[in-house]
Amino acid sequence: MAEGRCSQGKEPAEAMISLVALGEPLIQLNAVTPGPLRYVAYFEKHVAGSEANFCIAATMAGARCSLIARVGDDEFGRNIVEYLRGRGVDVSHVKVDPGAPTGIYFVQRHFPVPGRSRLIYYRKGSAGSRVGPDDVDSSLISSADAVHSTGITLALSDSANRAVHKAFGEAKRRTFDTNIRPALWPDLAAARRAILDVLNYGVDVLVTDPDDTQILLGVRDPEEAYRKYRELGVQTLVYKLGAEGAYVFWNGGSYFRDALKVAVEDPTGAGDAVAGYFVALYLSGVDPRRALDLAVAASALVVGVRGDNEALPSPREAEELLKAL
């Protein structure tokens, strides 16, 4: 197994691939000061949500990315659409739903565990949870190089779950981030059933971590996890280890990328940065080791600020960080 820093393989491809992500964009209210939210006086507002973050990361890495979603007919919904459009994401398939509000969540930082954040959601009955199969444009799906979603979207509602199944059933290629959020599921058995059901479509790139894999497969070891995921039809596995780094396993090889040592302001969004960056580069033909190097660098920049996606770099900026550290 290769380890450490790697500059092998092609530079980020010039050919632009087309991706579609399906999931809920949210408004994030991030505590300006660390500690319990009951004593926080000021919050910063950011646009976030796993698939929205994925799209911005993929766009920064050189892909085209369209988001299928719903937002409320409110100021937060308009904020999301305008912000994503400004970041280069195609929002022509984001519908405005007058019957439900835009979802929000709060970020509690560095409490009770320093260096970690806790997320408190207010998204039940949100516009984003009402996305369904009718929102999935078959012509958009068939024209895309790959479709991406997450375990979060599967958990939102029955209609959102069915939307993912429709999109994955029509997609040329599929990428998926397990992203198990226990607070969104009735129990972990339900999460396991729903995610394994989606993996049956055959996933080209799976992004996950030991905690989610323990729930799904009952194992934590990276190599054992890859063997079991391969049996389920997964082609390439990105296995995140948080502050330690990440593995990538593919047909014929494996590689470990150590994490970059940076000051952590808020780790929220780091995994989405890895997913979007890696998928965009890897599916465009970049060597998986090179793609993971740049994806880990992108995530290192994300955790240094509040907000999930404002610090996402260009490949040149990610490379500059790799050379500096």
UniProtKB/Swiss-Prot annotation:
PANTHER family: HEXOKINASE FAMILY MEMBER, PSEUDOURIDINE KINASE-RELATED. Involved in the degradation of glucose via the semi-phosphorylative Entner-Doudoroff pathway. Catalyzes the phosphorylation of 2-keto-3-deoxygluconate (KDG) yielding 2-keto-3-deoxy-6-phosphogluconate (KDPG). Belongs to the carbohydrate kinase PfkB family. Its EC number is 2.7.1.45. ATP binds at N179, I180, R181, K240, L241, G242, A243, E244, G245, G269, A270, G271, D272. It comes from Thermoproteus tenax. The gene is kdgK. Substrate binds at G49, S50, E51, A52, N53, Y105, Y121, Y122, R123, R181, D272, D308. This is 2-dehydro-3-deoxygluconokinase. Keywords: ATP-binding, Carbohydrate metabolism, Kinase, Nucleotide-binding, Transferase. It is an enzyme of class 2 (transferase).
